[in-house]
């Protein structure tokens, strides 16, 4: 159970990091 929660948290952090990186890349490309 704890492993499942830690895995879900890791997946959520990875998704947020990828989303921020993608938005930042698009913003830099637009300028």
Swiss-Prot record:
Q: Which residues cross the membrane?
A: 3-23
- Record GO terms (molecular function): electron transporter, transferring electrons within cytochrome b6/f complex of photosystem II activity
Going by the entry's taxonomy, the superkingdom of the source organism is recorded as: Eukaryota
Q: Does the keyword Calcium apply?
A: no
The cellular component terms of Gene Ontology attached to this UniProt record, alphabetical and capped at eight, are: chloroplast thylakoid membrane; cytochrome b6f complex
Q: Please explain the role this protein plays, according to its UniProt record.
A: Component of the cytochrome b6-f complex, which mediates electron transfer between photosystem II (PSII) and photosystem I (PSI), cyclic electron flow around PSI, and state transitions. PetL is important for photoautotrophic growth as well as for electron transfer efficiency and stability of the cytochrome b6-f complex.
Q: Quaternary structure per UniProt? A: The 4 large subunits of the cytochrome b6-f complex are cytochrome b6, subunit IV (17 kDa polypeptide, PetD), cytochrome f and the Rieske protein, while the 4 small subunits are PetG, PetL, PetM and PetN. The complex functions as a dimer.
Name of the protein this chain belongs to: Cytochrome b6-f complex subunit 6
- Recorded source organism is Welwitschia mirabilis
Source organism lineage? Eukaryota, Viridiplantae, Streptophyta, Embryophyta, Tracheophyta
């Amino acid at each position: 159970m704890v492993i499942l929660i830690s895995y879900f948290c890791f997946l959520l952090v990875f998704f947020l990091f990828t989303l921020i990186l993608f938005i930042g890349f698009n913003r830099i490309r637009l300028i």
